């Protein structure tokens, strides 16, 4: 795929990305998978990666659900759902996306100028959507068996960590369950921000029973709160 003058922020060398995926993807299909709606709208209404994202979401969900079903025959439907939530969520997808190829998936995305200016290449929501789009593209070209193999390889670490992490990367849920078990009440989050409106950075502090347990920093309040909850979860479990 050759970059145009409007693709300046994106890498036009996708060898490392394809190597990380472990499969080849046709240039036209790969370009579609990398085309965020912001870029499409700024370039005459090109097709976006949203349909591939829709497909990839199902591929990911089926692959992870099937693996969990077979690996944990002793767990209930509710427990399996929680394990799946530790892998199939925005933050988990973004984590995997950041490890894809040189510079991560974000370096390869086609974004509009607005997203480019506001740090879109590292936004968890954009990375997660792009990850699902890539999985959709792999499925479309190679079929479900190959796509499943890609999913299970890329998400192997998260699948292994999930059973040890409660609700996993949904740290706020994990933390709330932990504090309820210990009779500590419901955690709250204090938020502060720095920087201009188009490039804000948020800091969240987790407060439990009037005591600060952990901080997190992110480009959105939600991301900062998740990180702060994770820090608090680790601190609480270390106390036990």
Curated annotation (Swiss-Prot):
GO cellular component, one term: cytoplasm
Cellular localisation: Cytoplasm
Positions bound to Mg(2+): 53, 129, 132
Names of required cofactors: Mg(2+)
Domain RNase III: 13-143
Keywords on record: Cytoplasm, Endonuclease, Hydrolase, Magnesium, Metal-binding, mRNA processing, Nuclease, RNA-binding, rRNA processing, rRNA-binding, tRNA processing
Enzymatic reactions: Endonucleolytic cleavage to 5'-phosphomonoester
Residue numbers annotated as active site: 57, 132
Gene3D superfamilies: 3.30.160.20, Ribonuclease III domain
Annotated SMART domains: DSRM, RIBOc
GO biological process: mRNA processing; regulation of gene expression; rRNA processing; tRNA processing
Chief place of localization: cytoplasm
PANTHER family: RIBONUCLEASE 3 (PTHR11207:SF0), RIBONUCLEASE III (PTHR11207)
Assembly: Homodimer.
Biological role stated in the UniProt entry: Digests double-stranded RNA. Involved in the processing of primary rRNA transcript to yield the immediate precursors to the large and small rRNAs (23S and 16S). Processes some mRNAs, and tRNAs when they are encoded in the rRNA operon. Processes pre-crRNA and tracrRNA of type II CRISPR loci if present in the organism.
Protein name: Ribonuclease 3
Organism: Nocardia farcinica (strain IFM 10152)
């Amino acid at each position: 795929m050759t970059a145009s003058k409007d693709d300046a922020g994106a890498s036009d060398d996708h060898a490392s990305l394809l190597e990380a995926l472990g499969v080849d993807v046709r240039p036209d299909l790969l370009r579609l998978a990398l085309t965020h709606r912001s870029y499409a709208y700024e370039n005459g209404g090109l097709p976006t990666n949203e349909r591939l994202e829709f497909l990839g979401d199902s591929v990911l969900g089926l692959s992870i659900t099937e693996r969990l079903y077979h690996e944990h025959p002793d767990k209930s439907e509710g427990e399996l759902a929680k394990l799946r939530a530790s892998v199939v969520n925005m933050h988990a997808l973004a984590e995997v996306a950041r490890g894809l190829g040189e510079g991560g998936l974000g370096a390869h995305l086609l974004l509009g100028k607005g997203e480019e200016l506001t740090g879109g290449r590292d936004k968890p929501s954009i990375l997660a959507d792009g990850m699902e789009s890539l999985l959709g593209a792999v499925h479309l070209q190679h079929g479900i068996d190959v796509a499943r193999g890609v999913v299970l390889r890329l998400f192997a670490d998260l699948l292994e960590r999930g059973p040890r992490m409660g609700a996993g990367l949904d740290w706020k849920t994990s933390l709330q369950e932990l504090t309820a078990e210990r009779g500590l009440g419901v955690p709250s989050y204090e938020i502060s921000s720095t920087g201009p409106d188009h490039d804000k950075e948020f800091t969240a502090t987790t407060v439990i029973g009037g005591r600060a347990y952990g901080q997190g920093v992110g480009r959105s309040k939600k991301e900062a709160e998740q990180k702060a909850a994770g820090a608090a979860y680790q601190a609480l479990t270390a106390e036990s």
